Structures are given as structure tokens and as C-alpha cells.
Amino acid sequence: MQISSSSSSNFFSSLYADEPALITLTIVVVVVVLLFKWWLHWKEQRLRLPPGSMGLPYIGETLRLYTENPNSFFATRQNKYGDIFKTHILGCPCVMISSPEAARMVLVSKAHLFKPTYPPSKERMIGPEALFFHQGPYHSTLKRLVQSSFMPSALRPTVSHIELLVLQTLSSWTSQKSINTLEYMKRYAFDVAIMSAFGDKEEPTTIDVIKLLYQRLERGYNSMPLDLPGTLFHKSMKARIELSEELRKVIEKRRENGREEGGLLGVLLGAKDQKRNGLSDSQIADNIIGVIFAATDTTASVLTWLLKYLHDHPNLLQEVSREQFSIRQKIKKENRRISWEDTRKMPLTTRVIQETLRAASVLSFTFREAVQDVEYDGYLIPKGWKVLPLFRRIHHSSEFFPDPEKFDPSRFEVAPKPYTYMPFGNGVHSCPGSELAKLEMLILLHHLTTSFRWEVIGDEEGIQYGPFPVPKKGLPIRVTPI
């Protein structure tokens, strides 16, 4: 095939005619590529890791966190590095944040970028189907179900049951020379959790077995996760298997009898999705165990601090007692028991609880994990790093709570600024049982302040951490009837 000279001439003429355009296009492409590379380099340089120390290899700063006063640990680093800093805790690189804006970002506005995370051993002990190990549709469904058990309409009928537990608890105190407040508050909070989980529909013998197995399980919660015969963790996991089997029997019995009412268990049994499918036995069991776990130690720790703060502030105790005596006189006059409505008319006592939650900050922080690289305030939070919103630092900031070390319930006469007060967390993973916790505190304080007096034994001050901050030795007290 031949190309005519005229055709060849036209082709090259056309090519040369387009040469300026091709050169321009080439230059534009090169410039764009160079600019893109420069932008990536600039972004990489700009988005540096937060300042901080990673501590010792593997151990990081874990020992310092769990042996020091957490306030001192957090404050030292915040003062040195600012509101966002890096560290290394429990074998994981972490970013700690201590401002309301950062906490809002992690827990609310960009919560989808941060998943809840727990040590694998904790997930095994509580159960992988428990709601606080999840996010997304499964978590949303479960949280809605659990919250429905702790709404005012569901809590109203429990007031009389909680009051009975309070009376039983307090009567056992007066028969002893002294008590360990924390231990007895754990028993009380645990009994309330069991009642909330099962209602009053189970045989006492069945509940006793469940209590025993759960207590055996709980003993190993903070142990080294070595699943070897003879270890505490192994014994706890064995109890976990037995507890699951016992719960399976209870679930099966309720299904067979068609009795799906009663406590959180009844709510979970009655749950159906759009295809009329219910929750599996393991999903129900894991969430029952999870709720009992979440409702026990933290509530008991706060109750212990309540008694400590009231004891240390006698004028405040007198004012609280006066408020409660007024309610008690009305109850006696009407010849009835304490009611839900009564607990809504305790403004001072409620503020004392709010201030205790702030001052004690039993939940010092929570764990999240970045599911992708996240930019915040000019820093890079790498994918896979743990992120810890520091509730304790926010609660003890003089910017949001003047004179933060002073115990002053009057500060709650005005609502705190958003995201400065988060004793139960915030966002989609906030504690669904917060109202139950406050209710059991109010009812116990009503009877304690109107029928008893207590004095702290010994003069040892300080805080012990294991894992929640509580007064040293669990606050030994002596209780006497009025």
C-alpha cells in the first residue's frame, strides 16, 4: 500500500499545526502531576502524629497509667503536649484527647470512623454478641431493646423492688461492727442488676445459681488471660460456660411456657425483626451477662464515693437529709411506699449525685479504634490506633468547672455546656442504663439519710485503682440506726 506525497504532506502539516496544543497539554499534565505529588508531600508533612511519648517497648506507659493517680497521669501529659497526645497503653499505640470538641468528634459527629474496642479476653468472658462490642444495625437494634427496659415507663414498676433491696441491704449493715462500703455496694448493685435482667418471674433457686456462677466468672475479669488449668482466668471461663448453659435453660423454659415478659430477658425474648426472626439464645445470654456486668462495679463505685463525699461535708449531708425527711413525712402521711414521682422531687440529692459522678469520674476514659486514617486539628490519627476520650480531664477542667477539686453540687443548678459532662459516655455507645443507676442511688440515699448515720473508720485518705477509682480500702464505715 502506498501513501501519496500529498497525503503525507497533509498529515505532517496537521501534526505540526497541533504541536503547540500538544506541548501545552504535556506541560499541563506534568504540572498537575508535580502539584499532586507536592500536595501529598505537604499533607504528609502537615498531618504529623500528635506529640507525646510511647514509653518502653511493648509495655509503653501502661504501668504508669494503672499505678499513678490517673488525674496526675493525664494532667502531666496534657500540660506538656496539649489536648491531644500520643502514648502506648496495653500493647497498643494510642491517641488521648481531652477537649469537649475532640470527644464530640470521636463519640458523635464522626463516630462511624471509630469503633468500640475491648481486649479479646473481655469479649470472651462477657460474650461476643454483647451490644457494646458492636456497631451498625445490630448494635442499634440491641441498644433500642436494652434502652426500652430502662425508660421511665419500664422503671416505674421497679421502684418497689429496688426499695425492698435497699431495705434488705441496710438492715444487714447494722448487725455488723463495720462494713466495707464498696463490697456491700457491689452486692446491692448486683442484686438490682439481676432484678432488672430477670424481673420477678424466675424461681429464687434459679436466680441463686445464676448469681453464684456470675460471681465466679467475675473474679477473673481483671486476671491475666491465661486459659490454663488452675489459673483464675481458666476458672472464670469454666464458670462462663456453665452460666451460658444455665441461661439457656431459663430462655428455653420461658419460650416453652410462652412467658416472654419480665425484665430485660422478657424484652429480648419478645424481639422480632421485619422477617419475624428473634434473637438467638447466645445473643440473649451474652447481652444479659453484659448488662449485669455494666450495671455492677461502676454503680457500686459511685455509691461508695457518695457516702464518702456526704460524710466529708456534714452541712451538705444535713441539707440532703432535710430534703429526704420532707419526702418521708409525706410518704408516712399517705401511708404508702416511695414512688417514682417521689424520686423526681429530690433536686438537691440529684445534684449531689451529679457532682459525685463528675468529681469521682469513675469512668476515666473509654476506648475507641480508628477504622481509617483520621485528620483532627492538624494531626493524623492512624488507622488501627486506639483513641481515648479523657472524661476525667474534661470533668476536672477549670475552664468548664471552676475550682474543679471542690465538691460543689450547686454547680449543677445550671446545666453544663455540651460535651463537658459525660459520666455515662456520649453518642450511640453511651450507657443505656444510666437512669436505672441514678434511680437506685436516689432510693438508697432516701432510706440511708432518713434512718441511719454512718462514720468512716480510720483516717486513711487516698484512692485505690482496681480498675475503677474508689476510696482506699473500700471505705470502711460503721452504720447505726437513728
UniProtKB/Swiss-Prot annotation:
Main localization, broad class: membrane
CDD domains on file: CYP90-like
Annotated TM spans: 20-40
UniProt-listed InterPro entries: Cyt_P450 (IPR001128), Cyt_P450_CS (IPR017972), Cyt_P450_E_grp-I (IPR002401), Cyt_P450_sf (IPR036396)
Keyword Transmembrane: yes
Membrane topology listed for this record: Single-pass membrane protein
GO biological process: abscisic acid catabolic process; abscisic acid metabolic process; release of seed from dormancy; response to red light; response to red or far red light
Needed cofactors: heme
Tissue distribution: Mainly expressed in dry seeds. Lower expression in rosette leaves, flowers, siliques and stems. Not expressed in roots. Expressed in both endosperm and vascular tissues of embryo during the seed development and in cortex and endodermis in germinating embryo.
Record-linked Pfam families: p450
Residue numbers binding heme: C431
Record-linked PROSITE patterns: CYTOCHROME_P450 (PS00086)
Expression induction or repression: By abscisic acid, dehydration and rehydration. Expression regulated by phytochrome B.
Protein location: Membrane
Recorded family membership: Belongs to the cytochrome P450 family.
Role summary: Involved in the oxidative degradation of abscisic acid, but not in the isomerization of the produced 8'-hydroxyabscisic acid (8'-OH-ABA) to (-)-phaseic acid (PA). Involved in the control of seed dormancy and germination.
Record protein name field: Abscisic acid 8'-hydroxylase 2
Lineage of the species this protein comes from: Eukaryota, Viridiplantae, Streptophyta, Embryophyta, Tracheophyta
